[in-house]
């Protein structure tokens, strides 16, 4: 006597195999894990694209430098090492900008100082531990006469703040390179080269005088 196998209408063997796979809890867990990993990768990709769009590096940095090599092109990274003469020449074409808003970018500063002349480099200093901006920047111009035009913008309002613009010096603004500190006056010592409250030992020397005439009673 032959056995009859009841089959549901409209389902073939492939459909039944797929239905069995969907009922497997381990397979469900694997698929959920893969889906979570894909979503996490998409989220990180979106954050990375956002950081690049605003010109902020995701790694901790001491300073964020935007160098304008060509029109509309910027590069990030620390400046290349320069000789002492090259640094002095660059400093003569640069200005210090203080009280800069922490959310400012190099593009914002370029737009504010674009009327002063062609800009070669904009450096926004960052804290080496947190990576957050310190609130001041340096702007290097292509020509020296642009420095005077930039200094004329001292105490102008930039992003709601009154900025301070000064010619850049080799050292920090307000600190003289020749000031070594310390007292340079002539020290005032005690007379006689002995401490207060002490007297020299022995009888004081009175010098030799000329003997006066002897009175002879005889």
Curated annotation (Swiss-Prot):
Region feature Disordered, mapped onto this chain: 1-24, 169-218
Entry's localization field: Cytoplasm
GO biological process: nuclear-transcribed mRNA catabolic process, deadenylation-dependent decay
Pfam families: RRM_1
Recorded superkingdom: Eukaryota
SUPFAM superfamilies hit by this protein: RNA-binding domain, RBD
CDD domains assigned: RRM_II_PABPN1L
Entry keywords, A to Z: Cytoplasm, RNA-binding
Membrane-spanning residues: none
Compositional bias ranges of the Basic residues kind: 198-209
GO molecular function: poly(A) binding
A GO cellular-component term linked to this record: cytoplasm
Chief subcellular location: cytoplasm
The keyword DNA-binding belongs to this UniProt entry's keyword annotation: no
Domain RRM intervals: 93-170
Role this protein plays: Binds the poly(A) tail of mRNA. Unable to interact with the cap-binding complex and is therefore unlikely to be involved in translation initiation.
Subunit structure: Homodimer; Upon poly(A) binding, undergoes a dimer-monomer transition that removes the polyproline motif from the RNA recognition site and allows it to be replaced by the adenosine nucleotides of poly(A).
Protein name: Embryonic polyadenylate-binding protein 2-B
Native organism: Xenopus laevis
């Amino acid at each position: 006597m032959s056995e009859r196998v009841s089959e549901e209408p409209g389902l073939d063997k492939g459909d039944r195999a797929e239905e069995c796979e969907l009922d497997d809890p381990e397979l469900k867990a694997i698929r959920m894990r893969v889906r979570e990993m894909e979503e996490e990768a998409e989220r990180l990709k979106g954050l990375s694209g956002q950081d690049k769009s605003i010109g902020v590096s995701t790694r901790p940095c001491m300073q964020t430098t935007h160098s304008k090599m060509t029109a509309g092109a910027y590069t990030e990274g620390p400046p290349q090492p320069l000789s002492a003469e090259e640094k002095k020449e660059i400093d003569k074409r640069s200005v210090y900008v203080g009280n800069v808003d922490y959310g400012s970018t190099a593009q914002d500063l370029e737009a504010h100082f674009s009327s002063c002349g062609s800009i070669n480099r904009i450096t926004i200093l960052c804290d080496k531990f947190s990576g957050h901006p310190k609130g001041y920047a340096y702007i290097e111009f292509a020509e020296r006469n642009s420095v005077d035009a930039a200094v004329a913008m001292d105490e102008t309002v930039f992003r709601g703040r009154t900025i301070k613009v000064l010619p850049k010096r080799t050292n920090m603004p307000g600190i003289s390179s020749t000031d070594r500190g310390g007292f340079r006056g002539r020290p005032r010592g005690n007379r006689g080269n002995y401490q207060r409250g002490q007297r020299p030992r022995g009888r004081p020397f009175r010098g030799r005088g000329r003997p006066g005439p002897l009175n002879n009673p005889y």
